[in-house]
Amino acid sequence: MFFHKKDPIHTVKIDEPNPRFAQLLLEQFGGATGELTAALQYWTQSFHCENAGIRDMLQDIALEEFGHLEMVGRMIEAHTKNVDQTEAYKSTLFAVRGVGPHLLDSQGNTWTASYVNEGGDVVRDLRANIAAEAGARQTYEELIKLSTDEGSKKTLVHLLTREISHTQMFMKALDSLGKLTDPMFGNIQPDN
């Protein structure tokens, strides 16, 4: 069902490795609004969705998020692997765990499935996804501001751009259901 294509959609090229920046990147690898969370959230939601078009969209975006996870992982690896290990170990997380990506956020908290937000209702899930993409975008914007490496910035801008595209896709799906601006979902109407 899956094929790992060796040619990335966007080439990750780091000009100036910085292990401390790699620690910040862990937020998008093993953090609550990171790529692993998004991929698993959208993939799981797809099995609850009876609308074939929206199910396919959720699975397509989930697979793209796995590609983003790979890009972030390669960035973390490049920022930690090819530098003086004294520098890498100045970052506490890499001193304890070793170089490269880990299922941790930037503060060392372990990734948990409780980050995955799925509820079995397509409208609820699409709204949760729009919020999740907003969290990812905010994190990418902050990482771009903090990065001093042009190669890192290019990859982060690419990832930010794709998150915006995902938000637009989720909004279009909600609109197709007539629920983009409707605050209600479900079948029970509130009392007057």
PLM features: residue spans?
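Non-heme di-metal
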Residues: 1-192
